[in-house]
Amino acid sequence: MGMGLLLLTAALLLAAYNLWCDKAAGDSSERVLEQLNSDIQENINMSLPDLPSGESLEEAYIPDYVLNPEMDMPQEEVDGQEYSGVLTIPALSLDLPVIGEWSYSNLRTAPCRYAGSVYLNNMVIAAHNYRSHFGRLKDLPQGEEVIFTDMDGNVFRYRTAEMEILSPFA
């Protein structure tokens, strides 16, 4: 009986720790997101050209990434961490900052750019399955919009095509 009680206590402590990590990650993401959204808006305002009379923004402005898709994604530093942009999934009411470089410790804070670049259409974003991060992705139906906004304010829109859940040991 003592061993059973010990195991039950350990399980409860582990569950409490996981919930605490989830909340801490969510709180951190919210705080960083506020700063990044402000930085993105500031970057947009600084980079907009003066438009000739009668010309639309789309006609007058070609983003740097179109001219040079191999360029590094711009980063913004918040609390000593470099971020690549913001991931938005409207169907899940999810807005998350994306850290520019993947590591296990970074995953505890926010989703991370695991590999690739949004400019080359091969970016992979990794995140924990915290409810405040990617924990609800399994509920995302096919055809839903996923938006990534880089730190220059360029918006990239996608639709989910299929859902694949990988083994934790893949």
Q: Which residues fall in each region the model found?
A:
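Solvent-exposed, non-transmembrane regions of membrane-associated and secreted proteins
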Residues: 2-170
